[in-house]
């Protein structure tokens, strides 16, 4: 009886080992897939935007109805076993070499010498709802300096600059570009005054440089203050340090106001920066779609 029991136990142990090795072999295949990492922005609106871009490519499926509030926790289907790294948006170009792919905002891509129109493996269409805006503290919407700034940024000169400079990496969304001036503004009364604007270095500060020349025609000085993050430009508008900012899209502003109890409003949409998926360790989408 003991001999029979020993034989049975030996058989069970052998079978268990075989199954364990088989399982390990299967796990290595899954691990190979799961080793593919995609870095995405860690702020609410840009993370959702990145995930929606990946969903459009059939790489993931999000829960119904999550929209612009989606996070990695809302991924319902992940057939390619993608591992997501949530990274501060400004740092995404810096981590690109350490991950397989990264979804990067165009302003940070451009600042890192990437060309979104050429280097992105996947890019949003120019009809993206995430237009970059000029924003001011509530109550300053009708300030003549704000109106003068908006008119300059909404000019044909600026729209043409965007088209020529960025070749589709940044796209003007101004429907009817004007001559750069607002007929309702008394420019003579603004002569010698300064309008201060917080902006990211690229492309916003570059675009503002064109508007600066337009305002200079009316002897208005444009003080462009550059920031490399997504928080300070709103804080300095809220506390009155600067009059306006130009660096963000409307969904981000709405989320920022809700989280920080700030009172900043959009006064004009100027351009859109299509979000792109860039290759880091991978040079194509083959590893994701294979």
Predicted regions located by residue number:
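A bilobed periplasmic-binding-protein/Venus flytrap-type ligand-binding module shared by bacterial periplasmic
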Residues: 130-148, 274-287
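Ligand-binding "clamshell"
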Residues: 98, 111-123, 255-267
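Short, well-ordered beta-strand elements
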Residues: 34-39, 190-202, 220-226
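Short helix-initiation/N-cap motifs at beta->coil->alpha
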Residues: 66-94, 224-235
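Short, polar/charged alpha-helical segment
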Residues: 48, 52-60, 64-73, 201-226, ...
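Beta->alpha turn/N-cap motifs
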Residues: 88-89, 97-100, 104-110, 201-202, ...
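Bacterial lipoprotein signal-peptidase II cleavage site
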Residues: 19-33
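Periplasmic-binding protein-like
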Residues: 48-51, 55, 145, 151-174
């Amino acid at each position: 009886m003991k001999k029979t029991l020993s034989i049975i136990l030996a058989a069970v142990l052998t079978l268990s080992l075989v199954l364990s090795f088989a399982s390990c072999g299967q796990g290595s295949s899954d691990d190979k897939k799961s080793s593919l990492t995609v870095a995405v922005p860690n702020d609410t609106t840009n993370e959702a935007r990145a995930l929606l871009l990946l969903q459009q490519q059939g790489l993931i499926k999000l829960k119904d109805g999550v929209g612009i509030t989606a996070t990695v926790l809302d991924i319902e289907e992940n057939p390619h076993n993608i591992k997501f790294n949530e990274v501060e948006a400004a740092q995404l170009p810096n981590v690109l070499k350490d991950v397989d792919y990264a979804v990067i905002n165009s302003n940070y891509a451009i600042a890192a010498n990437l060309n979104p129109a050429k280097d992105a493996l996947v890019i949003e269409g120019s009809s993206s709802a995430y237009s970059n805006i000029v924003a001011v503290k509530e109550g300053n919407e009708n300030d003549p300096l704000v109106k003068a700034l908006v008119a300059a940024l909404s000019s044909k000169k600026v729209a043409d600059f965007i088209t020529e400079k960025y070749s589709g990496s940044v796209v003007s969304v101004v429907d009817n570009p004007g001559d750069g001036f607002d007929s309702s503004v008394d420019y003579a009364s603004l002569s010698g005054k300064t309008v201060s604007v917080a902006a990211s270095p690229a492309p916003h500060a570059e675009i503002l440089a064109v508007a600066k020349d337009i305002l200079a025609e009316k002897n208005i000085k444009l003080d462009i203050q550059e920031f490399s993050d997504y928080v300070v430009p709103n804080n300095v508008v809220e506390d009155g340090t600067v009059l306006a900012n130009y660096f963000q899209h409307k969904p981000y502003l709405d989320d920022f106001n809700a989280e920080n109890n700030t009172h900043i409003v959009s006064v004009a949409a100027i351009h859109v920066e299509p979000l792109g998926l860039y290759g880091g360790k991978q040079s194509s989408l083959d590893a994701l779609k294979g």
